């Protein structure tokens, strides 16, 4: 298909300059197509699989903590491609190739060839794949397959789970990577060594690999576009994961990782599912670890695994059973990092001097040393060690070599009473890792979520098997069910809790939020970004419920209360207020005392201050200048406490110079005062100068 795409692009360029008719339209369409292809190229270099579930997740999850500097080369190429994508806009100025006639036929040929190019491009392939994965499907048939552990553990052994970043078992191949991983190869001969372990859709990146292995479900985004995860109160609240179960069995769950736990919602996942302690890069920074022991992603693995060893000893001495989970980082794509403990270590490879190979060699040594320490300690006999790759390697400096190999994840189980064996799976994935661990702890247990133990000869149907048969045509049912774990299935009642969060099902969401329901009043989509625009542009056959401050919907609302505007499929509307929302409103109830007519264009808040400021009590005059502002009056307000408490609000009209003056009275000091305006989503305001001037009372001289 690549040759067809190349031919279509060349023909599109020729058709662009062949006729001056509609030249700018043709140039714009071609530039847009090239821009999309450039963006796809960058995403593919990062994900290794084009635009997939991982792409969608990270677009909607917190990117803080990502080692962006590691990808500077990719980004530089992307910027170059962006500039090249704009070249059609320059080509339209070349007139010597243009024919004065035949413009209509040329334009028709251009449109036809553009459609051919799109069909031949990876954009069409990935879009089609995502459509089949994310489209609404009936998941009822797989609901019985989702099983949670219930029976008690009779032997509560300690567990150490070591995730090796991108450390797939493919690196064990002595023909390709001779002597690269001698320590873990030796450990594998004494362990349950699982072979042919795949990564299904929804398990192929770090947080997804952790969710899949610890919960037995693929990770999908919530039914919508949640942003940064901090607007969602809980991470997969309906899932019951390994940490939840072990905590109920009296375990203490402890995580230590080198990267920022906020990245991709990892910390939120762990704290939502039974982990008592989550240590990340900030913990090591607070401990005073020297800067040389950090990379762009976080603390290096030598420091991390030393801390894991210290934590293991501390937890073991306490006498309470525990799960200690750690995640290495230095083998992260594209080139890896080398910690101080391995600076003098080199891996001589026929492939050349490749930094990632040195990092893998180092990781093998450091993990091997930690495993040996644990096994040789007086606590080793009561400990099960799990060594696993979090996912297959992303595009890296060895991608061309790995592409020629049979790829498989790493999964080893090591313990005093665990008989060494190699288990070759026919249709296994990381979804089954947690279930296998549970069977090693308690032989009668074989399932965790959709995961099935590799050691069970008569395991029931699994999501892994569904993903591997018939091109995975039944696997979207498992993805659809996993999506419901964000909110639960009882989502037809909405209410506002005491913290000002919207409670939908079992999830708590910080407004503003737009909920879209289908014609059967099943929750279809949750919009958390650009909600006012989405509300205006969404033409649903079901019901829409938009929750925000009442100021978003009406003029005379200066109390800061919450309101919900509900629009049913007949376009009947009703505005519910704070008392109704505190009690709860039923989305499927008939709307009484409704109004008809076109939907109102709701307002959205726009922050005018750069950052929150601490402000003492007193009377102030807010003065601001805005060169770009609406031509009509609008609301401006002062807010505090994460924008929950409205301190002052006024309907303002800028003067001819764009100046706005507004009194603000504070009865007490405010730690986080912010100023914001309420505008239609088509409007904007740009503040050039803003000052909060305290009124100084004039002394009485009488």
Swiss-Prot record:
GO terms for biological process: glucan biosynthetic process. Its EC number is 2.7.8.20. It comes from the Bacteria. The keyword Membrane applies. Its main location: membrane. Pfam families: Sulfatase. It is a multi-pass membrane protein. GO terms for cellular component: plasma membrane. HAMAP family: MdoB_OpgB. This is Phosphoglycerol transferase I. It comes from Xanthomonas axonopodis pv. citri (strain 306). The gene is opgB.
